[in-house]
Amino acid sequence: MKFKINNSIILVTYIFVTSSLFSQNDSLKKEIIANVIDSIDAHNQLEFEMFRSERNENNKFIEGKFYAKMENKPLKIYIKNEKPRQGAEILYIDGENDNKILLNPNTFPYISLSINSKNSILLAGGHHYVEQAGFSQMSKTFKYYLEKYQDDFFEMIYFEGIFNWNNKKCYRLRIEYEDYKQISYYAKNSETLYQICERELINIAKIKELNPGLEISKKLQDKQKINLTNHYSKTSVLYIDLENYFPIYQLIYDKYGLYEKYIYTKLVLNRPIKNEEFNRDYKDYNF
């Protein structure tokens, strides 16, 4: 079913931008957002390479790159790292292996481990957990803001034109959350930071920074005060491929500047992925 809205580093080259009146036309923005949601939700299986650059609590950017193949429902994902820990592999299938991740660290003693998906070793200095890989979080976020703000959401979105990025024509959208700020939140008994971030669709890495010493999966006490942000970011800049409406280049800013950068390349949407490719004994894997 189509998602409907009311009323119906790589060289980036500017192609054109329409008049300011057209560029901020709500109909165009609604069409782009609806197509992004539809496209992400329509593709259950996908492959890609992703480069990441993420700012840590010491104000340093940690880089990484990996190849992934995944199925969204039920969640199945295989990852092979290029940077850091080149050759390390991850396999996760929702509901199997006691919901643990199978990890081949590709280092001594060269044995595969089953570990909790929230184990910090899996982050490798990054911001996000395995369950958040891919594009589903973007679709969820757009749906969340459309439900919360309805047409007012489009007042936060600025269409900045069509650009060539990595030899692909892309819409560029800038989303401004002008009221972005830190807020206090009082936990309900036994909920965790991870559950709160998933429910509110806010940035887990940022919330960890704001609550040093609190484990992401530890149950909180009733009315325990924690620090959150009211949005995922202050500003998000998205390059959306005109061919498939996937946000293949993402720049995420907090109040201090660039916080996250994600680059997706070699995106494959239509190759069926066999069940055997989510098995530890698959011929190309080294678990």
Predicted features along the sequence, with ranges:
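Bacterial N-terminal signal peptides
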Residues: 10-19
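Non-transmembrane domains of secretory- and envelope-associated proteins
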Residues: 24-27, 55, 85, 97, ...
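N-terminal mature ectodomain segment of secretory-pathway/periplasmic proteins
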Residues: 28-112, 157
